[in-house]
Regions:
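Metal-dependent phosphoester/phosphodiester hydrolase catalytic core
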Residues: 1-253
Length: 253
């Protein structure tokens, strides 16, 4: 976990950046004069139906040449992954190459060897930053590495109500609950590759595992009594703002 104090800090948000497609958005983003950018997953499209990682290596090599130098060299970068940079479309914890994919992800984003992510499973992390005397804690989740199998067919997934089914896995859950309940931040921003509040579509979302979603929303509700809670999500190739009582979710994709 890192901590720092800054003034007038500005974040950009985004997800789903195919290395083989046009990226004409960057000049417009540069005009925003950002201090940091948060990549919310599918930061490359390197997955194959077989799950093998030969395309992933190529995808990262290409993306390294596509991402603007002013962004990668001058701005703070935070990143989580989703299925296409995890290595298997809609993949989860049973993906056999996930350890290799994790190493490729950490190397691409220049995560230091001293970072906790280098010494445990999963790419989840947290960062505390004091911005204009407001303490902001950013919590990045890994919704892939530990996730149970989806139920139903692709693009028509059903709710998996098995009490043993998980998105985050036991260790990440313990870390998340401890992080949130012991936080002294004014604002907590949760980064999740898949949507939390949206339920009215047949694609991947927290509601595919309703008990996990319930647990997360109860944790957020408990924390929101004293902390402003916000989530940022991706995946959907669209943008939106969702609200549940005092909890706001922003989808940027």
């Amino acid at each position: 976990m890192s901590s720092s104090k800054v003034y007038g800090y500005k974040y950009g948000l985004g997800s789903c950046l195919d290395q083989d497609r046009e990226q004409s958005i960057w000049p417009s983003i540069k005009k925003e004069e950002l201090d940091a950018f948060i990549f919310l997953g599918d930061n490359v499209y390197g997955d194959l139906p077989s799950g093998e990682l030969s395309k992933m290596q190529r995808a990262y090599q290409i993306q390294k040449t596509r991402l603007p130098q002013w962004l990668m060299n001058e701005k703070e970068i935070l990143a989580i992954w989703d299925d296409h940079d995890f290595g298997l479309n809609d993949g989860g914890g049973d993906y056999p190459y996930k350890k290799e994919a994790e190493k490729m992800f950490l190397n691409f984003w220049n995560i230091p060897q001293s970072d906790p992510r280098r010494n445990r499973e999963g790419i989840y992390f947290k960062q505390i930053k004091e911005i204009d005397d407001v303490k902001v804690e950013i919590i990045g989740l890994d919704t892939r590495y530990f996730r149970s199998k989806l139920k139903g067919k692709k693009n028509a997934y059903e709710r998996n109500e098995d009490s043993s089914a998980t998105i985050l896995g036991q260790d990440q859950w313990a870390w998340l609950e401890s992080s949130i309940l012991n936080s002294n931040a004014d604002i907590i921003v949760i980064l999740s590759s898949i949507q939390i509040l949206a339920t009215n579509h047949p694609y991947e979302k927290w509601d595919n595992f309703p008990l996990e979603r319930k647990r997360l929303l109860e944790l957020i509700a408990r924390a929101s009594r004293k902390i402003t809670m916000v989530a940022i999500t991706g995946d959907r190739h669209k943008s939106g703002i969702y609200k549940n009582e005092n909890f706001i979710e922003i989808t940027a994709s």
